[in-house]
Amino acid sequence: MMKYRYTYYVLLCLTLVGLASCEMKDELLGKGEQGGSGEVGVLDLKLKVVPPSYGNGGVSSKSSSTELIVPKAEDMIVKVFNASMELQDYFESYADYLKESQYVLEQGTYYIEAYSGDNYEVTSEYPYYELLDTCVIKAKEVTLVDKACELQSAILYLTLSEEFLNACKDDYAITITNGSGVLSVGKGDARIVYIRPGMKTTVTIRATEKITGKPVIWTFGLADSEGKINSQDLFRIEIKDLE
């Protein structure tokens, strides 16, 4: 008698599992509460982060004061907006999105935004990476979006020559401002600065000559031929002297 009860219990469990699987499938295919209309599909978002490449003489992408900071793809914030630009879903990180076994959406047009955090005006710590894309979800289909977050900041790469370091005291300060934000760089600070694109950025160097004790100031601007700064612009500045 116990044998038959055990067999019945196993069959009942298998039946329940099968029903659950069917319900999940019906949800994806638009059945059940959707009334068989087939109105939903799946968004399969494949996200990566691609740093800029400047070739020889550019900057590398590791993690010291003279190398690019590159965020991890799993740390990107992800937002999904519907066709009316209303926020559909918000994920604190791409890693949270990946926890979804299947990300189901009603059919229609969606806008995807993935980004690394705040878009600072001037910073040495938080380069701004971003992805903006549009996709169309079709009923009963999986829509693949395989895209890369790319750097949206401009880069200022500062190098101090031996000539400058020998001539000036260690109390020098380099101030970078784009009119909205400002950053001061001193001895031991990062030599790569990330700037939000926009109008011309001004760099001011203040130092003291070792021999004379005379304060010196040097100011110059960063911009393209149109007086602007664009995403991924690279400004390599070697400071040799202040004459």
Located regions from the model:
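Sec-type signal peptide cleavage vicinity
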Residues: 22-190, 197-243
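Sec-dependent bacterial lipoprotein signal peptides
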Residues: 1-23
